[in-house]
């Protein structure tokens, strides 16, 4: 086996030993640190030696050689393992690098990421090149492999085939299969998917569920089929039910499911005292949700709700690393681990004043010391969206009165419109809008109506969607066209238009899905978009999720997909797609 297949080469390992022998200097020394020992579950005093990206020693001794060493006096400070996000969807307007850069400022340095966007938009070789590029940034980036597209796909079987899935599962940076948004297929006889689950287990990797509202019997069956963890519990009782069936339970706090306070309160009321099978996730929230951090907020919430302080930190670090079989390099401050370390002012405040990621300062005494971006997206075939087609007014005909009634950010039900939709502009007296999904390649469209999205919006166009297709929604067809033409000019984005002029835009030049902006700038743009939509009658809090999930057939009850307007419960097509007037 070649040296490059190991994390550290033989030569590097010899250098690490030389530091213990006193013949080589470490690069950093955290002196007099009060640190969380994840194994003894105690706060202990120690000196922590770091060389390059590795913890070399933790204990009472000081290095003999200090000529190349930066000494940091940690007296009065508290040192904990940096936090891990085990369930990231790193394409929610931000991109994986800008998300990581932002989250590292709040102590989260390790991410286990969804591969779905890469799977949809890049060839496998291009995706794997990108995964290799991500090893070069200070954050530790890992991935999961989807088994389905969480919507009805035109080319679903060709995309999700055994050759592709197995190659992804075999990649060393891929730690799990799932999430299993198509679990009913698995449960009802899809043996190809079951084989992928089996292969995941054979590779000693994990399988992540997606089981909202699942009964005890369903949870038991899916555990028998190979699932290890689920993040969809919405009550303490649901979390306990998963624990009782042998799952690791991922407690979620996201922009559309901010459930953590309820989950913790109810688990404590149910008498739960042992938390080593619980972990935290924010489940791919949109930018503004992360304005004040990521995992740090969940730790603070847990402490506030009465979870023992050490358990709160363990659920954000050690428990996750142990679950994913990477405890030998992550999740603890101990000899041999990657140097991902947070320095805190107090145990009760999980926002670090300083953060070390892979042995590098990314935050020092409250100052961001890592703002540089390293990923050259164009070299990875991640480029602006090129729409070599257009739509005509004649494409914007609406006759089918069966539509989508939005009940919250993402849940829908079918409804029948009772207003006149054979017009160029809908009345603001009703909360109904035109809705179009148009194929990314311009070959087809689905026209319908949506109730409950907004009352006074002119037009919104978005290349950000669950399938990468184009979404248009609005009261006024001219404004919908104005917004559409602007996303073409931008190479992708989300655009609001009013009175034939662009009111607000978020450029998404990376595949039409992701921004290149720093997270702080993107947060302000998203907040403005939300405010503008709420002023125009959007009554929920996350319109980007609403748009993303218009096509999501893993959620009830009616969705717009490439096969048409689709009734999820019956599996029937309510209205079929049609070709655009002009074919390009």
Curated annotation (Swiss-Prot):
Stored SUPFAM superfamilies: Composite domain of metallo-dependent hydrolases (SSF51338), Metallo-dependent hydrolases (SSF51556)
The keyword Hydrolase appears for this protein: yes
Reaction(s) this enzyme catalyzes, per UniProt: adenine + H2O + H(+) = hypoxanthine + NH4(+)
Taxonomic superkingdom: Bacteria
GO molecular function: adenine deaminase activity
Keywords: Hydrolase
InterPro entries: Adenine_deam_C (IPR026912), Amidohydro-rel (IPR006680), Metal-dep_hydrolase_composite (IPR011059), Metal_Hydrolase (IPR032466)
EC number(s) stated in the UniProt entry for this protein: 3.5.4.2
Family, similarity comment: Belongs to the metallo-dependent hydrolases superfamily. Adenine deaminase family.
Name assigned to this protein: Putative adenine deaminase BA_3032/GBAA_3032/BAS2818
